[in-house]
Amino acid sequence: MAGIKLTHKLYQYYQLATSFLYAALLIRWLILMPLVGSRFLPGGIHEFLIYLMFYSSIMEVIWLLRFHGFKYGLLSRTFLKDLNFIYLVSVIHFYDDYEHALILKNASYSSFIISLSLSQAYCHWCKLFKRKGVKERTLVWKVNTFVTLPILYLSEFALLLLNIQVKNYHSTPTLDIINRVVLLAYFPVLLTAYKKLLTK
């Protein structure tokens, strides 16, 4: 019994901490953007963004499998989201030259950060509390679903498209093929997951 309570406490701490970290990402962007502009923005925020996306996704997958098992966990929208974030991190990390990556100076990078931080702060905050039955569709839910998420999806697609168009020395022929396949499958998979969100 004590072990179950500890597990639930740790789960709540994870959701709370992750929610605040994504809020901190937005605050960081709000501070940096007026000071340095899009040209120097990656130097002050990209490392934080990449680490946050990667580790929060890994932890969420662990919790997902812990509570729902492999069968239901791997077929969930949450797992698809986390897999997508991990893939995106692997594509745009630019670990050794992110200050100079042209892709990260594009407007889609800022819109991605804003929509990501808002949607994930809200998502993890909602998971702090158990809800039974049909969830109430509040104004915040509607804004997140019909405004924030579409901007996030379009911004990510733009970043992935730019990553193919703008060559860098991280690119390889195999990686280019994988990226093109992902782009082709992006909207069909996205629309399927989005439809499930609207009908749940």
Curated annotation (Swiss-Prot):
The chain crosses the membrane at residues 16-36, 45-65, 83-103, 146-166, 174-194. Its main location: endoplasmic reticulum. Keywords: Cell wall biogenesis/degradation, Endoplasmic reticulum, Membrane, Transmembrane, Transmembrane helix. Residues 1-15, 66-82, 167-173 are lumenal. It is found in: Endoplasmic reticulum membrane. It is a multi-pass membrane protein. Residues 37-44, 104-145, 195-200 are cytoplasmic. GO terms for biological process: (1->6)-beta-D-glucan biosynthetic process; cell wall organization; chromosome organization. The keyword Endoplasmic reticulum applies. Changing H124L: In KEG1-1; temperature-sensitive. Increased sensitivity to chitin-binding dye Calcofluor white and zymolyase. Shows K1 killer toxin resistance, and reduced content of the cell wall beta-1,6-glucan. The keyword Membrane applies. Changing N84D: In strain: KA31a. GO terms for cellular component: endoplasmic reticulum; endoplasmic reticulum membrane. Interacts with KRE6. Involved in the biosynthesis of (1->6)-beta-D-glucan polymers of the cell wall. Required for viability. Involved in maintaining chromosome stability. This is Beta-1,6-glucan synthesis-associated protein KEG1.
